[in-house]
Amino acid sequence: MFEIIKKSIEWGGRTLSLETGKIARQADGSVVVNYGDTSILVTVVRKKKEEIVDFLPLNVQFIAKSYAMGRIPGGFFKREGKPSDRETLISRVIDRSIRPLFLEGFHDEISIVCNLLTYDTVNPPEVPALIGAVAALAISGVPFHFIIAGVLVGCDGNNNYILNPSVQEMKVSSLDLFLSGDERSILMVESEAKELPEENILNAIKFGHEHLQPVIKLIKEFADTIGNKFDSFAPIDISDIMQDLEKHSKDFEEAYSQTVKQERAQTLETIRNNILNPLKEAGKDEKLITQAVKNFERSLLRKIIREKGTRIDGRKYDEIRQIEVEVDILSRTHGSALFTRGSTQALVVTALGTTQDEQIVDDIEGDRREHFMLHYNFPSFAVGDASAIRAPGRREIGHGKLAWKAIHPVLPDKSEFPYTIRVVSEIMESDGSSSMATVCGTSLALMDTGVPIKSPVAGIAMGLIKDKNDYVILSDILGDEDYLGDMDFKVAGTSEGITALQMDMKISGISFEIVEKSLEQAKAGRLHILEKMNSVISEHSDDVKGHAPRMVSFYIDKDKISAAIGAKGKNIRSVCERSNAKIEIGDDGKVSVFAMSSAEAEIAKNMMIDSITELEQGAIVDVKVVKIDKSIVELELFNGRKGKMHISEVANQHIESIESILKQGDTFKALVIDFEKGGCPKLSRRRVDQETGDFFEGELYNEEKKDSSNDRDYYNSPFNRKSGHRKRPVHSRSSFSNRNNRPKFGNDDSSSSFY
């Protein structure tokens, strides 16, 4: 029934296999990829389009359902919903790797679905997903003539490169680099690095490319065994339209010489309309005209840049646009920055929170918590578009993650800065490289906030104009240069090295020479941008902003953690409610208190210490009247504990009723004279001077008081004998008193823990 074809190799110490003929046989191409115990089903379906479109309708979806990890989805709904960020990012990696390889003019609808069947939590799925997508395309009949592969590269503590590192190895790796390429060139790179120099990054790319070759050979052998032939494809001939456009060359040259984006865009729109209308009247298809105009502009612009040595806005190849930097522009936020580079502008705002504000991520490796979040927003008005603002799409998620990777390596450890950090980048204007403007703005905003980042970070986007063996590398590309060029190579880092990298191609790959020169030119541009940023702010503020929450931390004994939390969280909840603060207690006994002011944080700290302090006989405490019975007053102590006081301990003279002296809600100072069997303290008001808070050492019992048989046990305390009171040291335990002399709890580092 099944005609199964399977090929496999040993790669990176694990078995990589490709199999087809058993599952999803109605798809044009279907491949099951196994790498270790990670298994992915990749399907390719092609739908021929009669309608002419000026883009490639390629849709790539990576789907990771929880059954692949042996789990049931959490939450109320037990069915997967919208794609996670991880699924979106893997889908983008595959899309960006294969999109440039489709033949120009091919516009059939292509759907690629990568279904994660099993995941061993060791081998990340990005690599087998891309390999499976290429293998499925190779056997689908789609005119896709390039065979590529993907690889992960890590770097250990001895600067040794690791091929396809495991999830555990990636946690300690100084490099997380994914690249795709063919036998001769590099197609796509994405990485996060811990300030690695350009040479290390280039060597990692060479290492990865070398280890791609066995996989490329495997895919070719797999496709040859099946023997599927590619469908013939011939693009529609638009040479006659292209020839007709030659007479508009001068108009386009003048338009592209305008340095202001809005003026340039308006002029180009006018020229295009002047071209479109007559050709439509002549019977030409509008979409073919649009495609021809795009090709003509691309060819003309590339010629201008190569021959004249200047760019659209008059800059040299390696020249950076004018940069303006401002910080602290929003008064009530925790930190803000406005970064403007030419006509690209990012308003970046930070907000600080507690551990309770961390993002819980349901990842394929299991639930994890993120204490640093970076959200990138690209509203339509940033490019003068009138369309409605919608939820973030793949592009916004991808750009935000790239900026996150650029900043993440320089963030302080959570033990050093325990706040949860959220950064939001609002793109106000865009003319290319808005993601790198986000990187620069985020670095500035974090320093303005007071986050102790290790070094400032800047980012730059590089472009490429390539004609056969001749090429020109452009620094800080405009939107038009990105649209009409061959490469978008984003590089972010500090003065010491690279923290993030992303390279996308519009051609079928570039050489190591171009990669190396791009990195060198990007470094010069990055250092120039850092110089501009450092002239405004080069170090983080000494303290967080006035509107940011204050934090104080201290340690308690581990055996007191349960008491600090209380039954079902009662104690910690009570302290939070009474102090208007947030309190977090770690397994190591570290208590972190967050409040809107230092004074509130200190009050909450003292309340927490009081709540776990054991009372002693002779202690003087603040109390509050909760309930009054005939002869007993129920009291609440500073730490929320309950206490009792007999009518005979209210005053030093005979009273007919407690209400004649006290009423509910009254507060006063009381002496702890004894404890009931259950631990409830017995208290006395009459033995304490309410003005000074001192203990009446020598006061005698008023003879007018009469003992009763019911009260005899209550007075059977050494403090209640009529012969006088035993002298003993007395400790004041007031939640409002000076605590400088009170005993320390563990290692109290509160003075050094304020931010």
UniProtKB/Swiss-Prot annotation:
Localization per record: Cytoplasm
InterPro entries, per database record: ExoRNase_PH_dom1 (IPR001247), ExoRNase_PH_dom2 (IPR015847), ExoRNase_PH_dom2_sf (IPR036345), KH_dom (IPR004087), KH_dom_type_1 (IPR004088), KH_dom_type_1_sf (IPR036612), NA-bd_OB-fold (IPR012340), PNPase (IPR012162)
Cofactor(s) required for function per UniProt: Mg(2+)
Domain spans labelled S1 motif: 618-686
Biased composition (Basic residues): 722-731
Family that this chain belongs to: Belongs to the polyribonucleotide nucleotidyltransferase family.
Name of the protein: Polyribonucleotide nucleotidyltransferase
This protein's encoding gene: pnp
